[in-house]
């Protein structure tokens, strides 16, 4: 009876909202739990944050980092950093799935690293760090029978961490077939459970980089000037 109650409770949608301070800290944390989730990103994008998709370069917090620039010059947006070492285009594609509504007709920044372009493509070990079954469910439940979604499903099938009914459902998309009634039922219930976990765990273990951002901002000139910023960049490069 106890296990049945736990399963039933996990399927009940659990709503929560995050404080502005928590979202502010999450935006610069590059936390993989936030990357793989949906709710924190949805609230942030609804509140004017702009997603910055990238990889390891986002981790270098120098005075010219986009989060530092936005802080110093009081931009009307805040960068929301998504990605870290190893988060290549396939992981980023999957990570975007839960925020399509929030990003419609809005701006985003994509930083493309030359190291992404290899003959072997996405490193499976790196992909495993960012793989989100929640976002896989989101993708599958909205996938269309078009070239883009079939190709994405094919690439996801090549990743060892993709297993079980998610893997079977991806094969349906690759073959241009509709999901079965059971697959839709399974994916909807799995998504509901994973969404509840996302709502609960997203605010845990955030890297607090607020002090670091504010410290780096002090190096910048008080008035925004491309010439002055170039000087700061040259000084930083010489250090």
Where are these regions (language model features)?
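N-terminal membrane-targeting segments
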Residues: 8-15
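Residue-identity detector for glutamine
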Residues: 21, 30, 42, 88, ...
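Membrane/wall-proximal cationic-aromatic binding patches
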Residues: 15-77, 95-96
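Phenylalanine-focused residue identity feature
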Residues: 18, 35, 45, 49-52, ...
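Secreted/periplasmic serine-hydrolase-like ester/acetyl group-modifying domain
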Residues: 137-239
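Membrane-embedded segments
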Residues: 58-148
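A broadly tuned preference for mixed-charge, low-complexity surface segments
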Residues: 27-31, 98-114, 157-177
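Short, small-residue-biased leader/transition segments that mark boundaries at the very start
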Residues: 1-6
């Amino acid at each position: 009876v106890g296990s049945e109650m736990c399963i039933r409770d996990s399927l009940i949608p659990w709503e929560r909202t995050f404080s502005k301070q928590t979202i502010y800290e999450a935006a610069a944390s590059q936390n993989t739990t936030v990357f793989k989730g949906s709710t924190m990103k949805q609230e942030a994008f609804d509140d004017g944050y702009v997603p910055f998709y990238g990889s390891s370069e986002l981790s270098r917090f120098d005075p010219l980092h986009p989060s530092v620039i936005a802080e110093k010059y009081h931009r009307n947006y805040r960068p929301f950093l998504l990605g870290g070492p190893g988060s290549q285009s396939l992981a980023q594609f999957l990570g975007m799935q839960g925020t399509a509504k929030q990003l419609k007709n809005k701006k985003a920044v994509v930083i493309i690293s030359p190291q992404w372009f290899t003959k072997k493509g996405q490193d499976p070990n790196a992909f495993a760090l960012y793989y989100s079954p929640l976002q896989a469910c989101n993708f599958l439940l909205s996938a269309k029978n078009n070239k883009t979604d079939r190709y994405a499903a094919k690439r996801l099938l090549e990743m060892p961490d993709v297993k079980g009914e998610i893997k079977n459902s991806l094969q349906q998309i690759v073959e241009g077939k509709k999901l079965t009634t059971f697959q839709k039922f399974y994916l909807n219930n799995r998504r509901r459970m994973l969404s509840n976990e996302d709502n609960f765990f997203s605010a845990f273990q955030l890297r607090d980089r607020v002090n670091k951002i504010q410290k780096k901002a002090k190096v910048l000139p008080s008035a925004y000037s491309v010439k002055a910023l170039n000087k700061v960049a040259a000084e930083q490069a010489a250090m």
